Amino acid sequence: MAHNPVGINSTLTTNTTSGTTRSVDKTLHKTDALRVVAVGAGAHIAIGTFPTATTANYYIANGESEVITLGACRNQTVVGIVTVGVAGTNKSRTVVAFPEGTGSPFQLGDAVTLTVTNQDYWNFTHQIVVGVSTSTNPSGFFNQRILIDNDYGVGYAHTALVATNFAELRGSFMVAALGDATGKLHYQQVQSSKGANG
């Protein structure tokens, strides 16, 4: 089967004592398939928001490679970003707005990553969705908006999102592994002749 690699190859060190060994790159979800290779030891693999691998999870034998389905990619263009205070604390959360006429592909508990060209101070990585507007006119806005548990830590100092700058919110995931012994787990998103999308 032909594979078209997407993004970078990442590596985890696997061992028998920790099922919480996770990828540190918090991978952007760009295809519906993840190719994994176990080197030095077999491993159980878990994929998710903050996964923990156990012996109940998918197993790949030492020296073998497999392609695991990730499900459909979820991403949406962002047209507005604001911060809101959390009552009784010094913290804030982030509200992102999507274009009118579109909806949110994200649900409560999803991990998301925001990328903004030319305004990278708005960027954040692998933060959790804690609220999704369901009204057709939430607080006077006709855009669908979601609330994300992301605190920039700088109050309201950022310059507003520039309309001509591209901003995208995309789902992200982490990989965890529990090895039969000390080894390496290599993984990379791929597009394949079977129809992986991105």
Residue locations for each model-derived region?
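Beta-sandwich interaction modules
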Residues: 21-26, 63-72, 170-174
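Short, intrinsically disordered N-terminal pre-domain segments
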Residues: 1-24, 186-198
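Intrinsically disordered, low-complexity Pro/Gly/Ser/Thr-rich segments with frequent PxxP/GP/PP motifs
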Residues: 10, 51-74
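Short, surface-exposed beta-strand/strand-loop-strand elements in extracellular ectodomains
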Residues: 37-57
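Surface-exposed ligand/attachment interfaces on beta-rich extracellular proteins
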Residues: 9-30, 51-54, 86-102, 119, ...
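Hydrophobic beta-strand segments within beta-rich accessory/binding domains
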Residues: 31-38, 175
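Small/polar beta-strand repeat architecture
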Residues: 73-93, 97-189, 196-198
